[in-house]
Amino acid sequence: MEATDNLMRHRDVAMILATGGSAMVRAAYSSGTPAIGVGPGNGPAYLEKTCDLPLAVKRILDSKTFDNGTVCASEQSIICDEDMAGAVQAEMERQGAYFLDDAERERLGRFILRANGTMNPEIVGRSVDTIAKLAGLDRVPAGARVLVARETGVGRGHPYSNEKLGPILGFYTGADYRDVCGKVCEILHYEGAGHTFSMHTNDDKMVDYF
């Protein structure tokens, strides 16, 4: 870290792009050199009412399953209006997602985070089948593409609000787009403030609002 700190403060360095842990990002911001930093983050994706739902789900699942979810910019959670939840779940299941029941959600939630609240490295880049076996989930069908867990809160005690570098998604709902926007902001400020947000919509007014 000392060598990295010296490099960031060097007079020939004009700009720093810091990615990785929060300590690295803090060091970049305090170096005195202009810096753009991104630490861990739970990037949410909003499936707005006007979206092409099959296409939006395909894009999210393709993104989240690429390299078994190791890309930090891939979706970490999805969110939709409450009255769309059934349709979203049905389409996700049609395309290979497996929604955990309450007991499975609790079991996997205890596995994906360590006691200190950090991500369990055993999930990183692992397949759904491997994660299911490691976590003791014996009802996940062979060939499931992602594991999806319903989540309501953000922060400690809500493991699916954390970054998950594996084929695991949190699933949130909001009363309407205003409620969704508030939850999205809460998610984004929990880890890696302002990390990544995406929205699937065909309504330009929704784009402007967010």
Task: For every predicted segment, state its role.
Residues 16-28:
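Glycine-rich phosphate-binding loop
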Residues 7, 27, 210:
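Hydrophobic/aromatic ligand-binding patch that stacks against planar heteroaromatic rings
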